Amino acid sequence: MRIHIIAVGRLRAGPEKDLIGDYLTRFARSGRALGLGPARVVEVEDRKNGGMGNEAALLRRAIPDGALIAVLDERGRVESSPDFAQRLAGWRDQGRGDLALVIGGADGIDPALRAEADFALSLGKMVWPHMLVRVMLAEQLYRAASILAGAPYHRN
């Protein structure tokens, strides 16, 4: 199952981008044998004054046809890392070829796009900067693959 992290805004060179690259490289290595990956980041333009509706249109265009859509949203479901790993495995086992993990801009996900999504995931009750959400999501993908592979990265 190919993973597409689709996010508003361009991440400049720096520690966040380096961390994302590191975690997605690790995910590619550990996920391959599990039928997960590769994962890639797709960035859409951050239209400062365009509003969430315009961002949603750009995000929709970046989502592959037929992909399962999971939005990152503070109102979404909070899951443990093992539960998220099992959810990924379940989607993979359903034969889903593509998973779009969608991250909105500073104002979040447009309500209409949220309603269209197959799933809404929250990384906790706190609100996180959308640029950091990418790093946290990339790490959780790697952690999920490690859990599914029985590797010692995740500790209960």
Curated annotation (Swiss-Prot):
Family annotation (Gene3D superfamilies): 3.40.1280.10
GO molecular function: rRNA (pseudouridine-N3-)-methyltransferase activity
Catalytic activity reported: pseudouridine(1915) in 23S rRNA + S-adenosyl-L-methionine = N(3)-methylpseudouridine(1915) in 23S rRNA + S-adenosyl-L-homocysteine + H(+)
Sorted UniProt keywords: Cytoplasm, Methyltransferase, rRNA processing, S-adenosyl-L-methionine, Transferase
Annotated Pfam families: SPOUT_MTase
Alphabetized SUPFAM superfamilies for the sequence: alpha/beta knot (SSF75217)
Class of enzymatic activity (EC top level): transferase
Binding site for S-adenosyl-L-methionine: L72, G104, L123, G124, K125, M126, V127, W128
One Gene Ontology cellular component: cytoplasm
Classification via InterPro entries: Alpha/beta_knot_MTases, RlmH-like, tRNA_m1G_MTases_N
Keyword Cytoplasm: yes
Main location: cytoplasm
GTP-binding found in the keyword field: no
Record-listed E.C. numbers: 2.1.1.177
HAMAP family assigned to the protein according to its UniProt record, in alphabetical order: 23SrRNA_methyltr_H
Function: Specifically methylates the pseudouridine at position 1915 (m3Psi1915) in 23S rRNA.
Subunit structure: Homodimer.
Family the UniProt entry places it in: Belongs to the RNA methyltransferase RlmH family.
Name of the protein this chain belongs to: Ribosomal RNA large subunit methyltransferase H
Species name: Roseobacter denitrificans (strain ATCC 33942 / OCh 114) (Erythrobacter sp. (strain OCh 114))
